[in-house]
Amino acid sequence: MDFSLPSEFAKSALYYCPQFGQFICNSDYRIERNGIDQYLLIYINSGSLCIRTDGMTAEAHEGEIALFDCRKPHCYWCPDKVDFYWFHFNGAGSKQYTEYLTERFGLVHEKQPMLSLKDQFRTVVHSAQYGMSTQFASMNEHQISIAVHSIL
């Protein structure tokens, strides 16, 4: 898991990702929280991940994404082995967009075209990692915001 500190501009005008990474987990993996002030997007590379929040329960499988509001109590776990990219995000329009998409489609989405979706997740994770230690951090904030918007 990695962390990044968004600029004041990113906090006010862009989507930004303060935490991100790739996890490979077994059935011991379980996260249960009362809430944190962020939203979460997950892309399943292989395996499956179960999610429970806001009166809904769903299971995301390989090639699918999960989206939910982490400000509400939530729990997610893997029934077996799972490999996934993930990032917490926030910023302009995050609340409204997350509410709209989860009300319309639920917690798990099968996006089309799926081929580029995994690349967008990689862009977020790698741009955030690269931006943490270089003079290109502000440029990467824009790339991250564009990639998050493309995924949504």
Residue positions per predicted region:
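A short hydrophobic beta-strand segment most commonly corresponding to one strand
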Residues: 40-43, 65-68, 80-97
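Solvent-exposed, well-ordered amphipathic alpha-helical segments
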Residues: 48-52, 59-63, 83-85, 113-118, ...
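Amphipathic alpha-helical segments enriched in hydrophobic/aromatic residues interleaved with Lys/Arg
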Residues: 99-152
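Generic protein-terminus/edge-of-domain signal
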Residues: 1-61, 72, 78, 95, ...
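Short C-terminal domain-edge/linker segments immediately following a structured domain
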Residues: 49-54, 72-74, 82, 97-99, ...
